[in-house]
Design a protein with these regions (language model features):
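Conserved nucleotide-binding/hydrolysis modules and their immediate coupling elements
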Residues: 204-307, 317-319, 482, 491-541, ...
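Interdomain boundary/hinge elements
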Residues: 36-42, 150-162, 196-206, 242-255, ...
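Residue-level signature of catalytic and energy-coupling elements of molecular machines
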Residues: 14, 20, 52, 73, ...
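Canonical P-loop GTPase G-domain recognition
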Residues: 121, 131-191
Length: 600
C-alpha cells in the first residue's frame, strides 16, 4: 500500500492559498516542461478567478519522495460554510496559511475552529514574508493565542511553523534565510501529518462531495473510512433519513495529479470517486451489502438570509437570455441544490414562477445568481431578507462578528456608522498606523455596509464578517434615505434630457441606453421617489441652428456590481438580471397603480 497524506489547506480570502497549491503542484512535477502553468490552476471557474476567491473545493494529488499527498483546497469564506465542513472531514491534517502582515482574520478563525473541532493537527505557514512592514513573529504569537482561545489540545498547540513566500516559491524554517524551493514545507507535511488510520472491517465511505459527468451521470466523492471497496462490488447506500438502498459500484477512480485514474479497489484512507450509483445525496454513507453501518451525517450550517427569485417579466424579457421560462429557472435551482449544501429553495405561496431561495449570506446567493446569468438565464431577484427565528417565545435574528481594519484617522467614522446600524463594539487594537475594530452587528446591518465603509475610508478599509449566533431582535435599522428616480416611459435615453436633470440626483444609465417605464434610472437627492422623462429629445426647428446651442455635458453613470444592486434596492424594488445587463426596477411598473398601492 502506498504511503498517503490527506491534507486540507485553509486560509483567509487572498492570503495566497491557491498560489501555494500551484507551487506544490510544480514541486510534485505535475506540469510537463513547457506546459502552461500560468497559475490559479484550481480556481478553474471564471467567477473564482475574477473575484480571487475559491468557491468550490477541489482535489489534487502530488507525489513527493514516494508519498502521495492529497491536497484539498477549501473555500475561505464563511458564506460557503457548508463547503468547508464537509471538506475537512476528508483530511487528516491541515495547513493554516496566514498573511505575515494582516495576521489571522475572522475567516481564518472560522475555518480553524472547524478543523480543531474535528481534531486535525495544523501546520502554520506564515506567507508573504517578503512584503514590506510584515511582522512574522507577532503573527505567530497571534495564531498561538487564537488556537488557545479556540480550546485547542496540547498536541495541537505544539504546531510547526514554516515561513516563506508562495508567490516567490520558497519556504523555510526561518524567515531571515530564504531558500529557493518549497521542499521544506513538503517534508514537514510528510513528517508531521499522520498517515490515515487503516481500519479493517466492513467498508464505510461518507459522501462529502459530488461530481457530474455527462457521460456517466452523478459521481460520489468521499474518503474510505474503513475497509476496502472494489469495482463491481454490491453495496448498500444508507441515506441521511435512515432509508437503505442496495446498489452496485460500476467503477472507482482515484485522484492522480489534476485528473482521475481508474483503479480496481481502494483501501481505507483513500479519497476516491465512485461511478454508477443512482440515488444519493451528500452526507449518505456507502456501506456493506449485508451489515450496513452508516457513519454520522455531516451537520450543515443553517441558512441566515433569503431572497425572492422570480422569472423576468419586464418589458425587455427574452431579448438577451436563452433560458427565460419558469421551467428553466426551476430546473436550474433544483440542480444547484444537489451540489450546494447550504442552499434551500421553496415555492413562494403556491406560485409556479416565484421561489424563496435561502443561503448563508449575500455573497453566497449572488455567486449563484452571477453563475446563472453567465449560463444564459434571465431572472429577477428581490431584496435580501434576514431569516428570523423564534427562540423561547422571543423574536431572534442572526448576529455577525465584524472586523474592520482602517487607518487611524477614519476609526471614529467607522464606529459611528456601525453603531447606527445597531452594532456593538467589542474590541479595538492599534497596529502601527492602522486600527483593528471588532463589532457584533445584526446581519441586517451588514447589507449595504461595505460600499459605505469603503467610501468613508477612501477605499482603505479591509472588512470581514462571519456568522456568530442568533440573539434577540435589536430593533429597526435606518436603511438608505434617498428615493429613486424612475423612468416615465419606454424608449431610448437622450443626453439632452439627462443633462437637464443632473441636479436631481445621480444616474445609473448612460445616454443611448434603452429604458422602460418603471425602471430605476437614478438616485434622487431627496427621500421621495421622482418620476422623470429621460426619453425626451431636443426639438430642432429651422430657427435654431444645431451648433450654436450649448452642448449637453453628462456626468458618467454610477456603475454598480450585482451585490451592490442587491444591497441597494428597497423592499418595493427588484433587480433584473440578464446575461448582458443588470437593471433595477419597481415591482409595480405602472405609476398610477404604484401610487394607489402606496396610499393603501
Amino acid at each position: 500500500m502506498q504511503d498517503i497524506r490527506n491534507i486540507a489547506i485553509t486560509a483567509h480570502v487572498d492570503h495566497g492559498k491557491t498560489t501555494l497549491v500551484d507551487k506544490m503542484m510544480l514541486a510534485g512535477k505535475l506540469f510537463r516542461d513547457g506546459q502552461d502553468n500560468s497559475g490559479q490552476v484550481l480556481d478553474a471557474n471564471d467567477l473564482e478567478r475574477e473575484r480571487g476567491i475559491t468557491i468550490l473545493s477541489k482535489n489534487v494529488s502530488i507525489n513527493w519522495k514516494g508519498t502521495k499527498i492529497n491536497i484539498i483546497d477549501t473555500p475561505g469564506h464563511s458564506d460557503f460554510g457548508g463547503e468547508v465542513e464537509r471538506v475537512l472531514n476528508m483530511a487528516d491534517g491541515c495547513i493554516l496559511l496566514v498573511d505575515a502582515f494582516e495576521g489571522p482574520m475572522p475567516q481564518t478563525r472560522f475555518v480553524l475552529q472547524k478543523a480543531l473541532e474535528i481534531g486535525l493537527k495544523p501546520i502554520v505557514v506564515v506567507n508573504k514574508v517578503d512584503k514590506p512592514n510584515c511582522r512574522p513573529e507577532e503573527v505567530y504569537e497571534m495564531v498561538f493565542d487564537l488556537m488557545f482561545s479556540l480550546n485547542a489540545t496540547e498536541d495541537q498547540l505544539d504546531f510547526p511553523v514554516v515561513y516563506g513566500s508562495a508567490k516567490n516559491g520558497w519556504m523555510a524554517e526561518d524567515y531571515k534565510t530564504p531558500t529557493d524551493n518549497i521542499d521544506y514545507l513538503l517534508d514537514k507535511i510528510v513528517e508531521v501529518i499522520p498517515a490515515p488510520k487503516v481500519l479493517e472491517g466492513t467498508p464505510q465511505l461518507l459522501i462529502t462531495s459530488l461530481d457530474y459527468s455527462s457521460y456517466t451521470g452523478r459521481i460520489a466523492v468521499g474518503r474510505v473510512h474503513r475497509g476496502t471497496l472494489a469495482e463491481g462490488m454490491n453495496v448498500t447506500i444508507s441515506h441521511r433519513d435512515g432509508k437503505l438502498e442496495k446498489t452496485k459500484i460500476k467503477e472507482i477512480h482515484v485522484f492522480e495529479g489534476m485528473g482521475q485514474k481508474k483503479v480496481e479497489e481502494v483501501h481505507s484512507g483513500d479519497i476516491c470517486a465512485i461511478v454508477g450509483l443512482e440515488n444519493f445525496e451528500i452526507g449518505d454513507t456507502i456501506c456493506d451489502f449485508e451489515n450496513p453501518e452508516p457513519l454520522p451525517p455531516i451537520a450543515i450550517d443553517e441558512p441566515t438570509m433569503s431572497m425572492l427569485f422570480t422569472i423576468n417579466d419586464s418589458p425587455f424579457f427574452g431579448k438577451e437570455g436563452k433560458f427565460v421560462t419558469s421551467r428553466h429557472v426551476n430546473d436550474r435551482l433544483q440542480k444547484e441544490l444537489e451540489k450546494n449544501l447550504a442552499l434551500r429553495v421553496r415555492p413562494f405561496e403556491d406560485s409556479t414562477d416565484k421561489w424563496i431561495v435561502s443561503g448563508r449570506g449575500v455573497l453566497h446567493l449572488s455567486v449563484l445568481i452571477e453563475t446563472m446569468r453567465r449560463e444564459g438565464y434571465e431572472l429577477q431577484v428581490g431584496q435580501p431578507q434576514v431569516i428570523y427565528k423564534e427562540i423561547d417565545g422571543q423574536k431572534c435574528e442572526p448576529i455577525e462578528e465584524l472586523t474592520i481594519n482602517v487607518p487611524e484617522e477614519f476609526s471614529s467614522k467607522m464606529i459611528d456608522m456601525v453603531t447606527r446600524r445597531k452594532g456593538e463594539m467589542t474590541s479595538m487594537q492599534t497596529l502601527g498606523d492602522r486600527v483593528d475594530i471588532e463589532f457584533d452587528i445584526p446581519s441586517r446591518g451588514i447589507i449595504g455596509l461595505r460600499t459605505n465603509v469603503l467610501t468613508a475610508s477612501q477605499g482603505e478599509a479591509i472588512m470581514a464578517h462571519r456568522f456568530k449566533e442568533y440573539q434577540p431582535f435589536k430593533g429597526e435599522i435606518v436603511r438608505r434615505m434617498n428615493g429613486s428616480m424612475i423612468a416615465m416611459e419606454t424608449g431610448t435615453a437622450y443626453a439632452y434630457s439627462i443633462d437637464k436633470l443632473q441636479d436631481r440626483g445621480k444616474f445609473f444609465i448612460d445616454p443611448g441606453e434603452e429604458v422602460y417605464g418603471g425602471q430605476v434610472v437614478g438616485e434622487h437627492v431627496h427621500d421621495n421617489d421622482l418620476v422623470i422623462n429621460v426619453t425626451k429629445a431636443k426639438q430642432l426647428t429651422n430657427v435654431r441652428a444645431s451648433g450654436s446651442d450649448e452642448k449637453a455635458r453628462v456626468i458618467p453613470k454610477v456603475v454598480m456590481s450585482l451585490e451592490e444592486c442587491l444591497e441597494y434596492i428597497k423592499g418595493d424594488e427588484l433587480v433584473e438580471v440578464t446575461p448582458k445587463s443588470i437593471r433595477m426596477r419597481k415591482i409595480t411598473l405602472d405609476h398610477l397603480a404604484r401610487k394607489r398601492s402606496n396610499k393603501d
